[in-house]
Amino acid sequence: MVKNIGVLTSGGDAPGMNAAVRAVVRTALHYDVGVYGIYNGYLGLYRNEIQPMTRRSVADTINRGGTFLGSARFPEFKEEAVREEAIKNLRKHEIDALVVVGGDGSYMGAKKLTEMGFPCIGLPGTIDNDVAGTDYTIGYFTALNTVLDALDRLRDTSSSHKRISVVEIMGRHCGDLTVWSAIGSGAEYAIVPEMPFDEDKFLEQLRDQVGHGKNHAIVCITEKITDVNRLAKRIEQETGLETRATVLGHIQRGGAPTAFDRILASRMGAYAVELLRQGYGGRCVGIQANELVHHDIIDALENMSRPFKDCLLDLAHRLA
């Protein structure tokens, strides 16, 4: 039976991480299991930045964005000697299991610890919604609302000035945030990494629409596909309409989590503790068809893929 649990947040912050940590802490304490907060992710684990948590430690955190535990990039965690030091620090505090909240990079750290014999549970915390084994990640819907708000505002000014707006949206290699926000905002175009981007064909379609009287548009595009400032200049040259590029950037990560993210994170955090009490380790939690599930974390990273819903992209284009 697990006696003490550690919890950390890692990678890019996501709204709802605090709610997940709160659920881990209070569920563990409910079962008289000790719980320790690890500050600044895997870097803090390596540096022994570990403190005991009480119910009061997580009071008034469920509504806060970001992560009060902090996060940090720490690529050195790939080194076995670094992980051995991390496990040594966990043992010093008599912690015998770890809950990690983060994306697939954070899962990789949990996988490595699992392979070294230290039980871990991963919770999907990222606005990108790109983690295998779950329909939705903690923070995704809050980020979606943030993007929608920005697109609505850009629509106002674009229509007023007869302007095209090219909007770069986060997501890394996943186009979910782009597609869902395009549908929700009525954007004319959604360009995602899952589908090849034919720039010339896209410009031809845009020229045709402008030729038929279109005088403003919103173009949503996932980051890293192309230079949006260059694309905006080319659109302006090809269509004759003033075109501006907007990179939403890190504003997408901030803000108070939505009700959905608070509840999802709370369910997942509590479920992680239940799994550890049942003797599970090396698992990652997900939600599928609104039911909590868990998968082998190694299998999730190495063999599971997250299918892209082409039908949603088709819908975005049909409704544009």
UniProtKB/Swiss-Prot annotation:
Its EC number is 2.7.1.11. Pathway: Carbohydrate degradation; glycolysis; D-glyceraldehyde 3-phosphate and glycerone phosphate from D-glucose: step 3/4. ADP binds at residues 22-26, 155, 186-188, 214-216. CDD domains: Bacterial_PFK (cd00763). It is found in: Cytoplasm. It holds the Pfam family PFK. The active site is at 128 (proton acceptor). Allosterically activated by ADP and other diphosphonucleosides, and allosterically inhibited by phosphoenolpyruvate. Mg(2+) binds at residue 104. This is ATP-dependent 6-phosphofructokinase. It comes from Teredinibacter turnerae (strain ATCC 39867 / T7901).
